[in-house]
Amino acid sequence: MALTAALKAQIAAWYKALQEQIPDFIPRPPQRQMIADVAKTLAGEEGRHLAIEAPTGVGKTLSYLIPGIAIAREEQKTLVVSTANVALQDQIYSKDLPLLRKIIPDLRFTAAFGRGRYVCPRNLTALASTEPSQQDLLAFLDDDLTPNNQAEQKLCATLKQDLDSYRWDGLRDHTDKAIDDALWSRLSTDKASCLNRNCHYYRECPFFVARREIQEAEVVVANHALVMAAMESEAVLPEPKNLLLVLDEGHHLPDVARDALEMSAEITAPWFRLQLDLFCKLVATCMEQFRPKTTPPLANPERLTGHCEELFELIASLNNILNLYMPAGQEAEHRFPMGELPQEVMEICQRLAKLTEMLRGLAELFLNDLSEKTGSHDVVRLHRVLLQMNRALGMFESQNKLWRLASLAQSSGAPVTKWATRVVRDGQIHVWFHCVGIRVSDQLERLLWRSVPHIVVTSATLRSLNSFSRLQEMSGLKEKAGDRFVALDSPFNHVEQGKIIIPQMRYEPLMDNEEQHIAEMAAYFRQQVESKKHLGMLVLFASGRAMNRFLEHVTDLRLMLLVQGDQPRYRLVELHRKRVESGERSVLVGLQSFAEGLDLKGDLLSQVHIHKIAFPPIDSPVVITEGEWLKSLNRYPFEVQSLPSASFNLIQQVGRLIRSHHCWGEVVIYDKRLLTKNYGARLLNALPVFPIEQPGVPEVIVKRKAKQTAKQSGRKRR
């Protein structure tokens, strides 16, 4: 479809009307360019897909929503906007789309959250009830559906009142009641524990109400994990050919896809025996009480017993083999180099894939048959069997996916990482097997790039080291296929608004020097606090260990510090905002997750402290296998893995400072490698153009280290 004059006029009219809705709106050339590029892509006028980097201040959300809605209406398609996390998803749903509704009055939009974000009304009813008979009935369906105490029951009763009176839509993020994770895990549900259409609460269930709203919406706000799952199962969202898809925070997509395709399952022999025995009993119950129309051959007791016996013997053999690779009786991990399994293990995995597929098919057959019997049997007993069969199906599906992946030598042209772990819980040993592909470009090509006609991938940061090459390699997007890659200019004047400070540290932030380096960092940080130039500050660390060491050096400032983990992030940010707005000094302290999605303007954040260049950890099985593979191709892992990742992290960290034309301040980076190493200049060149200063650092004597040195020299003298 070409961009008609009428369509261009509609987009221009909405953009002009938007300017009247936003106080102090500043027209920005990069925003107009993004609107044009997005419109050309979604209308199919230019290229297949578009990857567009839109730095902070461009206004990327509205820049894709305006042309996206206009083209979706013209083509009678659904615009799906996907984000990396629930917080950003909720911001678009609760803030940006309601703003657009002021200029597009009949705009219909909804949000698609994962099942686990919604309350299950069946579980809520059980936990809110004070009637023993009601609790007994629901406890029969699920053993964990009785309240632990009176306070829990009262909270659940309040939530139920809010849900019943439509004051609450059932989404965890939309209630002002504090619900801890332990309680929420019992209030929500998962696919394996959901009765779906067979549930008494199906029509009013918040999850299914939200799913039905998707069919009527023009705009659906989802997240990457849900989109990947929906494309795999062809459920939830409209058909791919009827979609316009925008992937915001698109730099997360390869990792989300890899996480979605990672398979792990417990293979402890006694546990596995128990699961198989329970399944055999469940099949026997179905045959006796809910006889299916046609009897599957595998449901024959003797045949099913023999099938499960072979499966168990293979699992037991695999346990014995894996135990040879790990120290006896203790927690351990073994990774198979380059993902290459011994021939014997590979043959076991291939056979397990076939056997678990047959059990998966049997469980699915019984589940479908049971779902058709809800009007002719005791509902409570039937529902209990339905739940148990649904969980059995979930287990066999997971096992089957695991063994199929384990049977592959490669995925997307790269090895599949394979490893086993042994953990000890409550004195009991548990063995797990894990598989994940180190590249997911083929899967993304199949699920997204080839299925959806036109997709926009956007983020404030898509490049690393001024290049899209890492994104292209990890995602499978490529210019040869007609994909376009655009990097917009920042609308801010970084030279005038801020500067980078690299203190003259005596030590590099390496493990051997960590104590001395953090002591120096703490001394310079203290100096900055005492100068009282900045009300709002942020300190970012690459590891929790380093953050805790730093806190030991600034215990006298602890009341000023709002540390990640003390409270939920949104509460820390709320408290920080209140402090600064009342004229108090406040310091947020956190890890890399605080370098993303934190939008604090002006005095709320005028100084950012960065502990060191955040290279990715090198002890992950996936990273190690990728390194082995790259070396086998004569590629340098530091150049392909570590440096692009570090560049990306640094760009995000530095990007916390200048969020508007009125922002100002400094970014302090406590890592002299930016000036002393060859790669330092490349990392700096990828950052916004700030002037750089190199002040001195107060001299620090590290007492702890001095004591250790004295002890060591004492030993030598003796």
Region spans (language model):
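Conserved helicase motor "Helicase C" RecA-like lobe of SF1/SF2 P-loop NTPases
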Residues: 542-566
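Conserved RecA-like ASCE P-loop NTPase motor core of nucleic-acid helicases/translocases
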Residues: 78-87, 456-460, 535-542, 669-670
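Metal-dependent catalytic core segments for phosphate chemistry
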Residues: 251-277, 452-527, 552, 560-564, ...
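Conserved RecA-like P-loop NTPase helicase motor core
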Residues: 503-515, 566-675
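Walker A/P-loop
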Residues: 44-66
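Signature of the SF2 helicase/ATPase Hel1-core->accessory helical subdomain module
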Residues: 64, 70, 90, 94-98, ...
